[in-house]
Each structure stands twice: as structure tokens, then as C-alpha cells.
Amino acid sequence: MIQAQIDLHGLVSDEARSYVSSFIGDCKKRGIRCVRIVHGKGLGSRNREPVLKNKLRSWLIQKDEVIAYAQAKKQDGGAGAVIVLLKN
């Protein structure tokens, strides 16, 4: 069950990275374990390529608080979102 979410639409890479880090830290403090991070499909970016989608996956790998992540189901955002499981 998704307990919290953030939406990175409209953010540049550095802003998004900082926002994700703060969000994950806050969720950890609050005991939240399952979150959705909406990064978008990249349709509004230059060359219509997903910039944040690929960077987000790289950032999540580096976070000790993250156990696992996967692309969201279609009804939860599909290719435009990631579901993240955080440590207790």
C-alpha cells in the first residue's frame, strides 16, 4: 500500500535529487515504508526523452534507506512512476 508520494514534474535534475533525498529521509523518520515517486514519462522534455526517470533509478541505488524499487503498475502511474520500499 502506497503511504506517501512526491511528484517531480517541472523540477530540474539537481532540484529533483534534493527533493527525493529529503522526501526519503522524512518518510524514514515517520515510519513510512512504501512510497510512490512520480517522475513523468519525459514527454515534455527536450527530445521527448525521460531525464528524471533514469537519474532517479541511479539515485535510489545509492540510498541506504531503499530496499527495492520497481516501475509502478499502470493504475499507479505506470512508466511515469516508481514504487519504492524503504527500510524500517
Feature locations, PLM:
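Long, charged, low-complexity intrinsically disordered regions
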Residues: M1-C34, V38-N88
